[in-house]
Amino acid sequence: KETNAKPPA
């Protein structure tokens, strides 16, 4: 599971 599965702000 990816911990940072969201684009950088």
From Swiss-Prot:
Keyword Electron transport part of the UniProt annotation: no
Chief place where the protein resides: secreted
Organ and tissue specificity: Expressed by the venom gland.
Any GO BP annotation: killing of cells of another organism
Biological role: May act to induce hypotension. Presents weak hemolytic activity at physiological concentrations (micromolar range), and weak lactate dehydrogenase (LDH) release from mast cells. Does not induce mast cell degranulation, and antimicrobial effects. In vivo, injection into mice induces increase in nociceptive sensibility and causes very reduced or no edema formation. It also causes no alteration in rearing (standing on hind limbs), and reduces locomotion, suggesting an increase in anxiety.
Protein name: Cryptide Pep-7
Keyword tags: Cytolysis, Secreted
Keyword Transport attributed: no
Any one cellular-component term (Gene Ontology): extracellular region
Cellular compartments annotated: Secreted
Additional detail: The primary structure of this cryptide Pep-7 is identical to that of cryptide TyPep-8 from Tityus serrulatus (AC P84190).
